[in-house]
Amino acid sequence: MATSLQAAATFLQPAKIAASPSRNVHLRSNQTVGKSFGLDSSQARLTCSLHSDLKDFAGKCSDAAKIAGFALATSALVVSGAGAEGAPKRLTYDEIQSKTYMEVKGTGTANQCPTIDGGSETFSFKAGKYTGKKFCFEPTSFTVKADSVSKNAPPDFQNTKLMTRLTYTLDEIEGPFEVGSDGSVKFKEEDGIDYAAVTVQLPGGERVPFLFTVKQLEASGKPESFSGKFLVPSYRGSSFLDPKGRGGSTGYDNAVALPAGGRGDEEELSKENVKNTAASVGEITLKITKSKPETGEVIGVFESLQPSDTDLGAKVPKDVKIQGVWYGQIE
C-alpha cells in the first residue's frame, strides 16, 4: 500500500516547464476562438498557474493518504485489542440476573451458560421426580467430518471456523427430570429455545450450515454419562424457494419445462426438483461434573453428533460433532 501511495504522489508531482522563466503560463486567445466564446480579443487573456494548482492538488492527496493510513492503523489496533480481550468471565445464574441490559450488551455473556459457585463434584440429588428448568447448552467447538486436506488420508473430523454470530447457545429448555433409586437419571426435553442455525467453514473453504438442536431429546443413564437421541429438523422449511423458484409446498415443480428422460440424470434432477424436508436424527451424551442440591443447580459437559444441512435433499449431509458445556436447574 505504501508503494502505491508513493507512486501516486510521484505521478501527481507538478511538472517543471523549462520554456518559460516564470511559473505563470499566459495563454492569449485567438480572435476566432474568442468570438466563438463571446470574448473580445483585447480582453481575452487567461492566466493560470499550473505549478501552484498542481502543488495544492498533490498536497490534498498527500493529506488524504495520511488520513487513510491512520485509519488503517487504528482499525488494526481495535481488532487486535478485541481479540486480546478473549471470552468474558463465566458468571453464576444470580450474577447474570443482577446485571442490566447495558451491562450485558456486547460482552458475550448472553451467549454463555451460567456456572456454579461451590457445590459438589458428585451428583447429590435424592431419588424422585423433578422438573428440569433453565437448561442451557453452550458449544465450545464444532468439528465436521470431511475429506482430509492431505492426500491418501481418510475422512476425519476437522476443526472449523465459525461464520455466524455468537447466537448458537440453546437456552430456557425444560422438561421432566427423574432420578432413579439406583442413581440413574432421565431427562426429556419438551420446550425452550431448542435450535439455532449455525454455519462453519472447513479449512478448504467449504461452508457447512446446520441446525444445532436438542429437540425432543430423551436421555437416560448414569450421571457421569447419560445419552439419548433427538430430532434434527430440516435447515430450510417447505415454503423456502430456491434461486429457480422451486420449493417443497410452493413454487415450480421443475426449473425449465418438463425434463426429458432416458439420459441417466433422472435421479440428479429429482434431487433438485423434489424438495425433501424430512427431519433426521442426532445423538448426544451428557455428563454431570458438579451439582448443588441447595440451589438445585447442575453443570456438566456434552458431546453431540448430528447431520448437517442437505439443501432440501439435494446434498449428502456431513457429520457434525459439537462439544460444549451445559447448565440446568432441577426442582
UniProtKB/Swiss-Prot annotation:
The residues forming the transit peptide are 1-57, 58-84
What are the GO MF terms of this UniProt record?
mRNA binding; oxygen evolving activity; poly(U) RNA binding
**This chain belongs to which protein, by name?**
Oxygen-evolving enhancer protein 1-2, chloroplastic
Species lineage, top-down? Answer: Eukaryota, Viridiplantae, Streptophyta, Embryophyta, Tracheophyta
User: Domain of life of the organism in this record?
Assistant: Eukaryota
* Principal cellular location given in the protein's record: plastid
Q: Where is the signal peptide?
A: none
Keyword set for this entry? Chloroplast, Manganese, Membrane, Photosynthesis, Photosystem II, Plastid, Thylakoid, Transit peptide
**How does the protein associate with the membrane?**
Peripheral membrane protein
Q: Does the keyword DNA-binding apply?
A: no
Subcellular compartments? Plastid, Chloroplast thylakoid membrane
Provide the gene name from the record: PSBO2
Q: Which family does it belong to?
A: Belongs to the PsbO family.
Instruction: Give a yes or no for keyword Membrane in this entry.
Output: yes
Q: What does the UniProt record say this protein does?
A: Stabilizes the manganese cluster which is the primary site of water splitting. Regulates dephosphorylation and turnover of the PSII reaction center D1 protein.
Task: List GO BP terms, alphabetically.
Answer: photoinhibition; photosynthesis, light reaction; photosystem II assembly; photosystem II stabilization
Task: Give the matching InterPro entries.
Answer: OMP/PagP_b-brl (IPR011250), PsbO (IPR002628)
